[in-house]
Amino acid sequence: MLSMQLREGDKMLTLLEQAGKMGASDVHLTVGSKPMMRCQGKLLPIADNIVTATDMESFAAAVLTKHLNTEFKRIGEVDFAYSLNDAIRCRMNLFRQCDSIAAAIRLIAAQIPTCEELGLPQTVCDFTALKNGLVLITGPTCSGKSTTLAAIINKLNEEQSMHILTLEDPVEYKHAAKKCIINQREVGSDTKSFAAGLRSALREDPDVIMVGELRDKDTMSTALKAAETGHLVFATLHTGDAVTTVSRIIDFFPENQQQIKSQLAACLQGIACQELLPNAYGNGRVAAFEIMTMTPALRNLIREGKVHQLESFIQTGIQYGMITKADYIRKLQQEGKVQK
């Protein structure tokens, strides 16, 4: 069992730094339990000590601003970003349970990885060459969507001269200006909502808009409008494959599905669905992708509502950079990157 003794002072912040050094992706703190970290998808104890109510009250006092503390007291939960040190940023969710404070914390490397370091498929990297339209990075929670998007934005920042505007909840990776001007807006503090930020973005002369999550009908509708009007829009959804992704978007609009099918057929440029699998050595994880790029045939299928036929076109679309997740996993197995 991984173990360490907590030091005096701000115990929880010290613990987070240690978890980061151990390669943890997440930390969970609950009064009455040992502090836990998620490594390679598995929950493990970080320390032998039991987290106390005093520990969590001290931790909350250390990380919450006056505004966040007011919100936390008002609604019992708050989501925000926190810079732990020069190497690690955190996406923190503090919440109340059983009359005590608990926390779920995502640890994020401050250094933004490149597309090459992540091993992203070339088709995904090539999304940066698009001039307009909608590109969706999808997958379950903790599948690396935010990291993939950060690498894509970083590639644009290094290679092109443009205005990039991001809408995030909260801001995870911070981008320093290179060739691009980058404005990163945080939902809650910089803008009221994703939808409000998107509507405002249309008046802020962006070339690229990144939306942290298409949460609702209003956000989806505005993202489609932005993509239609000449912007390149990157966004995420919690879907596992391309067919489900297209169906989810259409289902957002039960009252005018034909219009949405036509809009989506016109502006969708690509979908990359990802999930993380244990690598063959048991000491890390590898991303598996399903990739759909757009051809005239695929646009016609979406326009005509024949979404169920998309998968067969993806299976035979290798010359367009397409691949199903099943085929991608078989490829990883053949390369010895994951176990059969």
What are these regions (language model features)?
Residues 2-340:
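Short, flexible helix-loop junctions that flank or precede catalytic/ligand sites
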